[in-house]
């Protein structure tokens, strides 16, 4: 039963973070939801930056 509570809390966290997507991606969870990945350098190849992960130096690329 505790697992259900944890998953419900995680769902609320993800949904509340996704509601402000007009401001861009700002954490790992929303980066992954938006089919991105986090890198500590600039985005490789033809990928573009769609936000940041865990601070301004780690980019979310898609």
From Swiss-Prot:
Main location, first listed in the record: secreted
Any GO MF annotation of the entry:
CCR6 chemokine receptor binding
GO cellular component terms? extracellular space
Give the intrachain disulfide bonds: 31-60, 38-53, 43-61
Q: Which Gene3D superfamilies match?
A: Antimicrobial Peptide, Beta-defensin 2, Chain A (3.10.360.10)
Source superkingdom: Eukaryota
What processes in GO biological process is this protein linked to?
cell chemotaxis; defense response to bacterium
Q: Report keywords, A-Z.
A: Antibiotic, Antimicrobial, Defensin, Disulfide bond, Pyrrolidone carboxylic acid, Secreted, Signal
Q: In which tissues is it expressed?
A: Neutrophilic granules.
**Signal peptide: which range, if any?**
1-22
Question: Pfam families attached here?
Answer: Defensin_beta
Residues that the record marks as modified (Pyrrolidone carboxylic acid) are 23
Q: Where in the cell is it found?
A: Secreted
Q: What the protein does? A: Has bactericidal activity. Active against E.coli ML35 and S.aureus 502A.
Family of the protein in this entry? Belongs to the beta-defensin family.
What's this protein's name? Beta-defensin 7
């Amino acid at each position: 039963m505790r697992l259900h509570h944890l998953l419900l809390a995680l769902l609320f966290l993800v949904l509340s973070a996704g509601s402000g997507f007009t401001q861009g991606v700002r954490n790992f969870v929303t980066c992954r939801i938006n089919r991105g990945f986090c890198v500590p350098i600039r985005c490789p190849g033809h990928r573009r930056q769609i936000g940041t992960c865990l601070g301004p130096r780690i980019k979310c690329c898609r």
